[in-house]
Structures are given as C-alpha cells and as structure tokens.
Amino acid sequence: MTAIRRRIMGLETEYGIANMQDSSRRLGPDEIARKLFAPVVEKHRSSNIYTENASRLYLDVGAHPEFATAECDSLHQLIAYDRSGDLMFHELADRAEQAVGGKVYLLKNNTDSLGNSYGCHENYLVSRDIPLKGLSKQLLPFLVTRQLICGAGKLAIPYPGAPNENFGPGYTMSQRADHVWEGVSSATTRSRPIINTRDEPHADSSKYRRLHVIVGDSNMSEVTTALKVGSTLLVLEMIEAGVALPDFEMANEIRSIREISRDFTGQVDIALRSGSTATPLEIQRAFYDAACAYLASREDPERGTPNAELTPVVDLWGRVLDCFDTGDFSPVSTEIDWVIKKSLLDRMAAARGLDPIDPRLAQIDLMYHDIHPTRGLFNVLARRGLARTLLAPETIEQAVRQAPPTTRAAVRGRFIAAVRANPELSYTVDWMRVKVNGEGGAEALLADPFANTSEDVDRIIESLESR
C-alpha cells in the first residue's frame, strides 16, 4: 500500500503534581489537584474540557492533570501543541500557588517516588489495511530500542520488593522501561503494554485505526520529542511502503527493554525469536540506515510533515548512534533528554561527592521536569545554552490561542469560540462531535480528521450569530 505522508497525530501527557507549603507541610495530590482545576471548574463547570485550541485538558485518574493535543498533521505542529499544554498548566499552577500560599510543582515526567508510573501516549493514524499483528511485529523492536535516542533518563532507586529491585540503584535511559509488562495488549494500567490495541480510531473505522504507543517517555526537550516522533513517523511510512526491514522480533521484549535501559554502550545482547542475538545499537542502526535511504527518495507532501522537518531528525538520529559507538555523548549533550540530565547529575555528584542514592540527586532528577519557565531545571539549562530548543516562544504562544488550522481541530476550535461567546448556551464537544444542547439545538459529526472545514458546523455558527 501507499505510505501515509500526511498523518494525523496526537500526544497525551499526564503530569505529576506536588505541593510544598513550607519545609514540613504539604497538601496531598488530590487536594492540590482540586486547587489546580478550581478555575477550570468555576468557568466551565467541569474538570474535563476542550480548550480554545481544540485540545483536551482534564483531571485523570490518580490526581494526574492530563493534556491531549488536538489533531496535528505535521511534526513541528505537534510539538507546538504539546508545548502549549505546558503553558496552560503552568498558568493554572501559578494561580493555584497564589490560592494556597505555597509552591505547586507540575512535573512532566513518568514516575513518582512510590514507584507509580504515568504516561506520555503517542497516537498515530494508520491504515486498517495493515494487519495489526504484522505492524506490531515490525514496530516493537524499534520501540523497545528507541530509548537509546529519546529516553528522558531517570535516577532509578528501586523500593524493596519492586520488580526491578534486582537491578539495584543507578541511572536509566528510560523512565517507562520498568513499567511496561506486555508487548501488545488492550490494557493501559493493570498490565501496561508497549502498544495498546484498544480500537478507538476517532475516524472512519473501516479505513483507519489509531496506533496507540504508550511506552514512550515524556520529554522536556523539544528536540528529543522531534526525534521520538519523527523517527517513528519514518518507520511507520517504511512499513506501509513495504520497505524490507530486518527481522528483529525479540524473544522477550519486556526483559530486553529493562536491560537496554541500563546499558549505556548499546551493546547488550538481546535474544531474538529466531535463536540469534542482536544489540540495541545494531537494531537502531538498521532502522536508521533504512530511514536514510527512504528519506532520500521520499516525495515531499503538499500537506503533512515536510522533508525539511525530517532531515534534521535523521541527522540527529545518526549522531546519537555514533555517540554510542565512541562512548562520548558530548556531541548531543544539549539535544537528548537522558544525556542532558545525566550530565547535570554527574556534575553535581562529582562536585559534592554524592552517592547515586543521595536524595539531593533524586531532587535534581525531579526538578529537571518542573514545567515552571524560570524554576524548572531544564528551562534553566535552556536559558544558559546548555539545552537546545526547537520552536520560537511566539509559535508556542500562538498554539495556546489557536487550534491547528489544517485538521478537524480547526472546526472544533471555531465551534468552541462561537458557543463560548454565548455564555448561556449548553453545549457538548468531543473528538468527533459538537452539539448545541437544548431546544433549537443542533449537532454535527466530524468524522474526517483531515477535514478542516464543515458546512454543518458553519450553519450552527451562523445560527448562533443570528440570535
């Protein structure tokens, strides 16, 4: 089949939340989450809303604030809307700090000190013509080893009785590696898989399925996010185009992903179902080489992710793999989250003579993920030129105010603006439907995620404006 070069994508990010009143007093997660969402509930009478940029902002199970981007159809657009969620939640956190008289921390990470994990879920629209089993078989080896190039890094200190206790304390490339339990499954929490198979395409189900990848880390670095998503886009296109990729089906994906996370040489032997072995570096290098060849002949799409956005992705991909060959990661020390954070922790440990389990290092690990623009350590590093950014601040600020103009999100955004201009109206919004409730109301189905216009919604808006 033909590769989808204009692909609908989205990111869902759950944030950790914490509060400090003073050195000895703090509010619990549930209470501080209620404080965080108080302005949302006051304005919209709900803690589950669609924002003016057509994304979804809500309070998830376990007191985790969550942001799901609107539908995007290009790489840089997706990164801008992912970052817009950080800005929206920072504004809410700032208001919550004023309300409670203490600091409110929102952490874009994936684990807490009690061993709980929360996710960054990637969504990619794929053709239903490709059997999910075949797609997963080719994609899993890439996803298991992808942490080499886009992990967020973590100072792992297993608690007694934890499944990863036998590994002992130490730095890992991936935050999520210790928290997945299956390769492919319909579960999301109880038996967390690498690929979730729950069939909710939010599109024509006879044509499309939504590939739901839940193994990835939340990234602070826009550059790392670009590599994470951009490399995955290329692998999906290659699978759809029928590019011959080596068979790296693993004998045990779950054991492999944990071992890879702790090996900074990329040379640990991974057992394959074929009976042979391969190293993570060898697997990533095979996908990288194939992506280079594919991109060289890829036709630039009129809409979607242009080659100009993918070329730097492939360049960085290769440079990270070269660092594993040499053992020197300084060439990417401002671009890859796990490398940036490890450099920071190593400098601090050396300067103060700290052991890996010193709580001061664990605190630095957490503060790296603080989304506060002046307090968060990643943002401090970025201002000092020690962490590279990708997008101009005004691009992200515009994404806060405006829905993506090229997808179904544009229609949802226009509807939201129209109904909120009439405060007395009751309305309902979902990914595929918008509705004005009550007598004289109207409903429109938004079945096509690629369509950025809707005559039905235009008629609803016209009727509202004529009231």
UniProtKB/Swiss-Prot annotation:
Its EC number is 6.3.1.19. ATP binds at residues 56, 69, 431. GO terms for molecular function: ATP binding; ligase activity, forming carbon-nitrogen bonds; magnesium ion binding; ubiquitin-like protein transferase activity. The active site is at residue 60. Pathway: Protein degradation; proteasomal Pup-dependent pathway; Protein modification; protein pupylation. It catalyses: ATP + [prokaryotic ubiquitin-like protein]-L-glutamate + [protein]-L-lysine = ADP + phosphate + N(6)-([prokaryotic ubiquitin-like protein]-gamma-L-glutamyl)-[protein]-L-lysine. It comes from the Bacteria. InterPro entries: Pup_ligase (IPR022279), Pup_ligase/deamidase (IPR004347). Keywords: ATP-binding, Ligase, Magnesium, Metal-binding, Nucleotide-binding, Ubl conjugation pathway. GO terms for biological process: modification-dependent protein catabolic process; proteasomal protein catabolic process; protein pupylation. Mg(2+) binds at residues 12, 58, 66. Belongs to the Pup ligase/Pup deamidase family. Pup-conjugating enzyme subfamily. The reaction mechanism probably proceeds via the activation of Pup by phosphorylation of its C-terminal glutamate, which is then subject to nucleophilic attack by the substrate lysine, resulting in an isopeptide bond and the release of phosphate as a good leaving group. PANTHER family: PUP DEAMIDASE/DEPUPYLASE, PUP--PROTEIN LIGASE. Catalyzes the covalent attachment of the prokaryotic ubiquitin-like protein modifier Pup to the proteasomal substrate proteins, thereby targeting them for proteasomal degradation. This tagging system is termed pupylation. The ligation reaction involves the side-chain carboxylate of the C-terminal glutamate of Pup and the side-chain amino group of a substrate lysine. This is Pup--protein ligase. The lineage of its organism: Bacteria, Bacillati, Actinomycetota, Actinomycetes, Mycobacteriales.
